[in-house]
Regions:
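Juxtamembrane transmembrane-helix boundary signature
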Residues: 47, 74-103, 114-130, 459
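Hydrophobic transmembrane alpha-helices that form the core helical bundles
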Residues: 95, 110-156, 202-217, 229-233, ...
Length: 590
């Protein structure tokens, strides 16, 4: 049996070990003994819950619906990349008890406000709240089906519109645009093309037909979904505010919901997934470098969203350091937890972290902690994400595509926004000859989707508030005893909720302002891809240059982090330039 490590007075850690730079020095304490990895399960389940609601349920089934498995290799690569990133985030917290962002702020005080902006702006878009509310509305009220307009520039209309097309086709002379409204049958597409042989008219028709094909010409809207979303945001706020120990509540809720999701997904998978879908997925995983066809209708932002949200994405990954600290990983045991000022006994929370003397005993404990953290994260995060991604993408492929890999007849009508989820639910229902059984499984699919999006909504609000409170307390209000970390957390939580409600209210009341969940998710994904590139570089420097050599990043993980920075940086810049900026300009009349 190993001997207990010797006790040390709470002395300051010298700069020769870990430079304190812009914050007070760390203090010495012994590294606690590491438990078995199964006792550490929790933080990575929360992180996986954050991933389930966007990448697993929305983006990758959407990409699969649009283009099959041609891009699925990037899905597997994205999850693996985030696995390595998350463990580098955990490394600093295990060794110091501080969040990774506090480590960044030791490098420069300016990183405090930069990280605060990067933690608030990408996550304020309420895509998960609107997504969950849309599914809940569909479950209760059905879809509000509306025709969509597709238009293209046309200088003049030189032929008359035949009677059979007049209800859907018109020419706007003032705007000089040819406009088609609603769905389009193959016969109508041929009739439209044969109207006029002029090249400009043919170009306009080709543009319109392509746009109708991408969306189906219909929008499956949801009744009252903005107001339902506001109610869910308020519900999450109340649940978190009244939790005696916030982390315990989040872990319990996420574990229950993730378990429920897995049971439903596996059940649906057994009943629905076709063998040809499995073979197509395996082929796609080895199709390294394959990209969706140009006519698939997939925007660059959707691809980036799928990559960023193959895991949790953005600063949510940084929230892993806050989760493991509250769970008591490593030196986080000495920090304290966030408790409710209303229902819990407020715990003292250390302003700065701790480190350990590098004695043989403490180094043995460090190796035990690092091994246990890696195993826990592999099973709780990596495998959870991979299995759920595969199941939900396979379900999408089996419902929408045939053995030849092509969309089944009529499936184009679900191409707009979140409509493909409405399509999935109704196709699930059609798999069963008994109407009662089919309706039950349709409802089960919606319940799974609501649970997936709600887990993400809960996790995003909690993690964003944790990270922001940590930044402000450590860097701005460290000497202010009135503003404890717990009080800051709850104030920021409700500010986030109010901002999200304001965006939803604008979507409900302001003409032209879109509340489409997929648009919100794309904006968040594009921003978070760039955020991951930036903090990836900071993690590299922190764990390579600031961390003591015996605890620092290894060569293999160094290569993985360099790859992650380049990967997310490239795709983010492209998405922002090509799609985010034009979308924002159109919203605000630019």
């Amino acid at each position: 049996m190993s001997q207990p490590a010797p006790e040390f007075a709470e002395e300051l850690v010298p700069d020769s070990v870990i430079p304190h730079q812009t914050l007070p020095p760390l203090r010495y304490r012994d590294l606690p003994e590491a438990p078995h990895w199964r006792k550490l399960v929790g933080p990575s389940i929360i992180l996986a819950g954050l991933a389930l609601g966007s990448g697993e349920f929305v983006f990758w089934p959407y990409v699969t619906y649009k283009s099959g498995f041609v891009f699925f290799w990037a899905c597997m690569l994205g999850v693996l990349t985030q696995f390595f990133m998350n463990l580098e985030i955990e490394r600093w917290t295990l060794a110091t008890g501080e969040s990774a962002i506090t480590g960044f702020c030791r490098l420069s005080r300016h990183w405090a406000w930069v990280m605060l902006i990067m933690n608030v702006v990408p996550w304020v878009w309420p895509g998960w709240a609107t997504g969950a509310s849309m599914l809940l509305s569909w479950t209760m009220f059905g879809a509000d089906i509306k025709p969509l307009e597709a238009s293209a520039p046309l200088t003049q209309m030189t032929v008359s519109i035949p009677a059979e097309l007049q209800t859907q086709l018109r020419f706007d002379g003032s705007e000089k645009r040819l406009i088609w409204k609603g769905a389009q049958t193959p016969e109508q597409a041929v009739a439209l093309k044969n109207l006029d042989a002029e090249p400009e008219f043919q170009q306009a028709v080709a543009t319109i037909t392509a746009r109708v094909r991408r969306t189906g010409g219909l929008k499956h809207d949801a009744w009252y979904f903005q107001w339902i979303a506001i109610a869910t945001l308020l519900l999450v706020g109340v649940v978190l505010t009244t939790s005696p120990v916030v982390y315990n509540t989040v872990e319990a809720l996420q574990s229950y919901l993730v378990g429920l999701i897995f049971v439903i997904a596996i059940t649906l998978g057994i009943l629905i997934i076709k063998p040809y879908a499995v073979w197509a997925m395996l082929a796609g995983m080895w199709n390294i470098g394959g990209l969706p066809a140009a006519d698939s209708g997939l925007e660059f932002m959707a691809l980036l969203g799928a990559l960023a949200f193959a895991g949790a994405g953005g600063t949510m990954n940084l929230g892993q350091s806050n989760f493991i600290r509250d769970k008591g990983y490593g030196m986080g045991k000495y920090i304290g937890r966030i408790t409710s000022p209303l229902t819990g006994n407020e715990e003292p929370i250390a302003d700065v972290g701790f480190h350990f003397h590098h004695t043989p005993e403490n180094m043995r404990r460090w190796r035990d902690w690092w091994r246990a953290a890696n195993i826990e994260h592999f099973f709780s995060f990596y495998l959870t994400c991979v299995v759920s991604l595969m199941l939900l993408a396979l379900i999408s492929y089996s419902l929408f595509r045939g053995p030849d890999g092509q969309l089944l007849p009529g499936m184009e009508r679900f191409g707009g926004g979140m409509d493909f989820i409405w399509g999935e639910a109704n196709l699930v229902q059609s798999q069963f000859s008994n109407p009662l059984v089919g309706n039950a499984f349709r409802s089960l699919f919606f319940v799974m989707g609501i649970a997936l999006l709600f887990t993400t909504e809960l996790g995003v609000l909690d993690a964003a508030a944790r990270i922001s409170a940590d930044i402000i307390k450590i860097n701005v209000l460290r000497e202010n005893p009135q503003w404890t970390l717990a009080r800051l957390y709850f104030v920021i939580l409700w500010i986030e909720i109010i901002l999200s409600i304001a965006i939803l209210a604008a979507g409900a009341l302001v003409p032209g302002f879109s509340s489409e969940p997929l648009n919100f998710l794309k904006i968040s994904a594009a921003m978070n891809g760039m955020v991951m590139c930036i903090y990836g570089m900071l993690l590299l420097y922190l764990n390579l240059k600031i961390m003591p050599r015996s605890l620092a990043i290894t060569p293999l993980r160094f290569v993985a982090m360099v790859w992650a920075c380049a990967f997310f940086g490239y795709f983010s810049l492209q998405a922002i330039q090509l799609e985010v900026w034009p979308m924002l300009k159109s919203w605000f009349g630019g």
